Amino acid sequence: MQLVTAAEMQTIDNYTVETIGMPQDVLIERAAMSVIDVIGAGHFNLDHILVLAGLGNNGADGVAISRLLYAQGFNVSLQFVGNVTRAKDSVKHQLDIIEKYGLVHAEKSDFNEATLIIDAIFGTGLNNLLPEGLQKMIKAANHIEKTVIAVDTPTGIDATTGEVRGAALKAHTTVTFGYNKIGLTQRVGGYLSGNVIVKDIGLLTPQDFNFSLPDKENSPSVATS
């Protein structure tokens, strides 16, 4: 199986959007629908779903996921991690959409009430230590051992090295897009990613670049679709 670094994945994302001309909103919707597919195919307790969204494209995926769940009648709460006024335009656009659905994001949610947490805080772009406040929140969430589905990469995991950037949210399942990431198969990242499912959302294939992509044998449980 081909594995990519965070930088290689970013190049693929940029080429797909900027050169090929695939709208970012299309990729976000496909990513969100992929996560919905995984939720529907799994045996998860869906009584109360909490979506934790960051301020970048990973957060935009999370907002779209919350909308799709809400539209299907699920009890879903959306909470932003960070000041939403500083969010990327992709997040703000998704917010405009969910407001028309009548879904309002919460200022703060009780982790204890959630039966399933969707981690859409940070994706593959993380390369620094998480803020101290977020580290504390993650440690608290890990302590109560809730079932977590990570969007693309568990928050706190370096997608290239598998190292923890201060703290990392432990996932039961990680739905990653396009190609599996090296960091989801190595070091503690391989453990904290849980069951990794690779979903095709229409990104450009690495074969179109001069990448030297490593193969990783004996990696953790990985499924593709």
Swiss-Prot record:
Cofactor: K(+)
UniProt GO cellular component terms: P-body
A GO term, aspect molecular function: NAD(P)HX epimerase activity
SUPFAM superfamilies: YjeF N-terminal domain-like
Cofactor note: Binds 1 potassium ion per subunit.
Binding positions for K(+) per the UniProt entry: N58, D119, T155
Ranges for domain YjeF N-terminal: 9-209
EC identifiers of the protein: 5.1.99.6
One GO process term, biological-process aspect: deadenylation-independent decapping of nuclear-transcribed mRNA
Role summary: Catalyzes the epimerization of the S- and R-forms of NAD(P)HX, a damaged form of NAD(P)H that is a result of enzymatic or heat-dependent hydration. This is a prerequisite for the S-specific NAD(P)H-hydrate dehydratase to allow the repair of both epimers of NAD(P)HX.
Family from the record: Belongs to the NnrE/AIBP family.
NCBIfam families per UniProt: yjeF_nterm (TIGR00197)
Protein name, entry field: NAD(P)H-hydrate epimerase
Organism of provenance: Leuconostoc sp. (strain C2)
